């Protein structure tokens, strides 16, 4: 599927490390305007494509843009399985129900992350915060364990691999239907959404 992306994005380079794909490089304009502070739904796939070796960055989330459309609970709609079938995220509401839980707690968030992200790979998470509002971000399972990667805004003090405990503490107890986790390193990014990225030189 990379060959199709190369037609639009140019030839991909070598696969990037976590640090190269992250470190504010997926969203370099974060400090330049509000639209780059509310574009998490674009930063997350930008990070994934960067891991694959494509030099892309996230465009801002402006009114009427494709990024705005994705931000309304559609983060998983930009992906499909390699055989062209629809993806199946592990939605938080379904996970709670299958465990007989009514709502999330700090401990249950950790359980959900660990259970859903068992295999080594890159995952997109959509989550609601305790104080309201939502976020799309990256979970990464490596040989060392499970990490939280924040492609929208890099924190030099914390580094690229952040502890998932940050998300467990801040995750809201009530979950919304469209929020969940999807493994994406083994998926196809749909070409019709490529305009949400800026192409690097």
Feature map (PLM): residue ranges:
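Short small/polar-residue motifs
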Residues: 110, 133-137, 176-177
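Noncatalytic regulatory segments and standalone regulatory/sensor domains
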Residues: 158-201
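Glycine-rich catalytic cores of cysteine/serine-nucleophile enzymes that process amide/ester linkages
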Residues: 152-158
């Amino acid at each position: 599927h990379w060959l199709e992306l190369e037609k639009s994005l140019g030839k991909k380079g070598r696969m990037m490390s976590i640090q190269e794909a992250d470190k504010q490089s997926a969203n370099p304009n974060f400090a330049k305007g509000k639209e780059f502070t509310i574009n998490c739904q674009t930063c997350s796939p930008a990070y994934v494509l960067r891991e694959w070796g494509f030099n892309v960055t996230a465009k801002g989330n402006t009114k009427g843009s494709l990024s705005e459309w994705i931000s309304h609970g559609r983060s998983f709609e930009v992906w499909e399985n390699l055989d062209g079938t629809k993806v199946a995220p592990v939605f938080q509401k379904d996970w709670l129900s299958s465990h007989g839980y009514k709502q999330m707690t700090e401990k249950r968030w950790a359980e959900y992350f660990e259970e859903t992200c068992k295999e080594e790979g890159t995952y997109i998470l959509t989550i609601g915060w305790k104080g309201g509002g939502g976020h799309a971000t990256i979970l990464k399972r490596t040989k060392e364990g499970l990490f939280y990667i924040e492609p929208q805004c890099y924190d030099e003090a914390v580094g690229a691999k952040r502890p998932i405990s940050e998300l467990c503490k801040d995750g809201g107890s009530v979950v919304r239907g469209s929020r969940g986790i999807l493994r994406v390193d083994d998926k196809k990014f749909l070409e019709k959404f490529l305009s949400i990225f800026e192409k690097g030189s």
